[in-house]
Structure formats: structure tokens, C-alpha cells
Amino acid sequence: MAFQKQSSGGGEAALAILRIGTGATLFLRHGWEKQPMHWAQFMAHFPNPIHIGAHASFFIAFVSDFVCSLLLTLGIWTRWVALFSFCNILVAWALVHRFAFFGRGPGSDHGEVMVLYLVALLTLVIHGSTAFSVDSVRGR
């Protein structure tokens, strides 16, 4: 059967699509809204799940959702930025959204999306970048 046939470059291409898709959607949905011109509106009500202050918590989310998502999309320091974003999303899912998954109640309307991000990011932490990344051009 054709489905059983493995291609040599398919895995690399699939992981590149996963990396680019994860980074781009994280940036477009969560990073773009955290750009510096919008910081004032976030500071007033940003959660403080690990008790380091709302400003510090927002800065961690900004680095994860804005900076790391762009680096992930380009394939720069893939494992490290995926790990940073994974940790940030895991903390948000656990401590802010209380592991909500099915969307029953306030703040639980996108738990399944958080799980999908976590699975994709963990895959990228384990595998790293692919041949289709800046890391591979730089020889890392």
C-alpha cells in the first residue's frame, strides 16, 4: 500500500510544518496582542500565577508568545525557545486555567488548544529543529 511507504524527507518536512505552524499561530494569536504598544492594557489585569508580580509574569508571557514564537517560526534556538514556551503555557494551563479542557466555566474556553500547543512544543523540544531552519544553516 502507498500509505506504508516511507519517504526519507517527509519527517523533516512534517516537523518543519509543525514548528512553523506552532510558532506562527502562537505569535498571531497571543504574541501580536502583547507587542509593546499594548503593554499598558495588559499590565492592569494580567494574572500572577507564580507570585512574582503581574509585570514579571507579563514579561515572561511576552518573551514566550512574542519573542520565542518568532524564533520558533524561523527555527532559531528551536529546542530552547520551545522549552521556554512549553513551560509558560504549562504554568498558564495549570495555575490560571486550572487544567480546564472542555470549556465548562469561566476561563476554560480553550484548554484543548493549550494541550495541542503543549504536545507540539514538547515534540519540538525532543526533536529540535529540522533541515528547514536557521539552526540547520548555522550548523546547530
Predicted regions and their residues:
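Extended, low-polarity transmembrane helix blocks
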Residues: 1-34, 55-63, 67-70, 74-140
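Membrane-interface interhelical connector segments
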Residues: 34-53
